[in-house]
A protein has these predicted regions:
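Asp-based, Mg2+/Mn2+-dependent phosphohydrolase catalytic module
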Residues: 2-101, 112-134, 141-331
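Short glycine-rich or small-residue beta-strand-to-loop segments that form or flank ligand, phosphate
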Residues: 102-106
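Conserved phosphate/oxyanion-binding catalytic-loop motifs
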Residues: 109
Length: 331
């Protein structure tokens, strides 16, 4: 397996969206506009795809458990929808454990560490050990440990006291342009407190002095019960549109987090599990499904509680050409 933790060099590149494409405003965000934005980002997303020749459609995840020895589980849209638990998920995961299936939560949420994510899921009634959760925050930490940029590194999005890169000076940024100018690279973990001031300072700083930008979370939105939260990739798309160099992405669908997940699956199961027996269960074609297809594991699209709830899923698949191995409604 290739080692995606190590990148021999970093090259700053620009990208121009098609002149006819306009990034949707936040008030106009819906499933279709999210797919359109992802599609316009496809040139710098993983490009290899071993599309399924036969997509299996089933009502529930529990109906297809016998196809897997390990399952990677997205959080939003699979385990929870905002602060609400996805109905039936606890019983299905209990059945999976009874069958000896190794479970691993793989989330693009990078604002918090795995301890906090474990506690958040536990509050909903879902019990995972800390080792059964991998976030793109962790992927960023490991990738940057192997590939240290010239310091200091400016951190945006809840650095806390636990985001540590050995032998690299990490500085939690504030809304002060002069501080941005003092760092040699940036990592964007989350955008919970993001606003136009943050956006303008980062954009102006990177245009004035191009430097590396690492983005831990490639999600455009996250599904909640009745709306979507706006996630880092949406704001980064505006940076790209304004002439900032392309960032280096570290979450799904990009391979670093999947390699980290494969290593963790081996540790948890105590054995080598063939890629054909590992499934990624997610709600989004361009992150969960594209990432799984590109990495060579099986992809499972859950449609009822995430991005595509109340949407014509077949239309979205035809539009994108991203074909899951399995399509299910819920757990």
């Amino acid at each position: 397996m290739d080692n995606y933790f190590v990148k021999p060099d970093f090259i700053l590149e620009k990208f121009e969206f098609k002149e006819s494409f306009k990034i949707p405003s936040i008030k106009d965000i819906n499933a279709e506009s999210v797919v359109d934005l992802y599609e316009n980002m496809r040139p710098f997303f993983p490009y290899f795809q071993d599309n399924s020749q036969t997509t299996i459609v089933a009502p529930k995840l529990e109906d297809i458990l016998d196809n897997f020895d390990a399952l990677l589980l997205d959080a939003f849209g699979v385990l929870n929808s905002g602060s609400a638990l996805v109905p039936g998920i606890i019983a299905t995961l209990d059945k999976a454990r009874e069958k000896g299936i190794t479970l691993l939560v793989v989330t693009n949420g990078a604002s918090n560490n795995s301890f906090i994510k474990r506690d958040q899921l536990s509050a909903l009634g879902l019990e995972f050990s800390q080792d059964e959760i991998i976030s793109s925050r962790e992927a960023a930490e490991i990738f940057l440990t192997y590939n240290k940029p010239n310091g200091p590194l400016g951190v945006m999005g809840n650095m806390g006291n636990d985001f540590i890169i050995p032998d690299l000076d990490c500085i939690e940024l504030e809304q002060d342009f002069s501080i941005f100018e003092e760092v040699n690279s940036f990592v964007l973990l989350g955008t919970i407190q993001w606003d136009t001031v943050w956006q303008d300072i980062l954009c102006d700083s990177l245009k004035n002095n191009p430097r590396l930008l690492f983005v831990a979370n490639p999600d455009i939105v996250a599904p909640h019960k009745s709306n979507f939260s706006i996630e880092p990739a949406y704001f980064v798309s505006h940076l790209i549109s304004n002439g900032v160099n392309l960032p280096f992405w570290l979450g799904k669908p990009f391979p670093t987090i999947y390699e980290l997940a494969m290593n963790r699956i081996t540790e948890l199961s105590g054995r080598h599990i063939p890629l054909s027996r590992i499934g990624m269960v997610g709600d989004t074609l361009h992150t969960d499904i594209l990432g799984a297809n590109s990495f060579g594991i099986k992809s499972v699209l859950m449609t009822k509680y995430g991005l595509f709830r109340n949407e014509n899923v077949a239309k979205m698949i035809k539009k994108t050409g991203i074909i899951p191995d399995f399509i299910i409604e819920g757990p």
